[in-house]
């Protein structure tokens, strides 16, 4: 594949002229620069409120055991390192709409007039899905997961004494990962739009996808509670089904257009 074909997805099929490869690279560079600046500004804001962030992130611990709320800082620089770590992930959350906009702006040349009109509503829906995933994880799944590990540790005769580094690394990645999982419909929408997957493929692989979802839910939610496992898997199954309908709708619209 020639270098000029790498950015072929940014051009409309009916376009007769191709944009030079270096211009595509320049657009990509500016997209990365804008995303980096946005994330850095968001990190600075979050770092300024690190005390509030710490109290929010440790709230699930206090609900289980007041003593667990006192985490151990084993490193001299833990206060700064963990604060930057927390500010980075919190910065992703608050800057997510702008990051999505810059990504959409990069692929904008390949969008039709109708798709450009629904760009901002689509970004709003995407952020709403992401935020829903984060909140569901924080208020429901995260406390249950921490409680499970707390009791499992005690069942072995050990006293839970978690460190700052371990706790925040687990909580931030777990919460952010769940939020990104809720972006599945948006990812599918983009893949279908550029012809990388089809409605037929998704419908054909539905049984395998559902089994995979339950396996992932079992790994993510290490609890013997069947109801928790079902409650964890059900939203993902619904999201996958919605992706199939999205792919079907897009195929039908494309066939009508032709």
Across the structure, where does each feature detected by a protein language model lie?
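Membrane topogenic/interface segments and analogous intrinsically disordered interaction regions
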Residues: 1-258
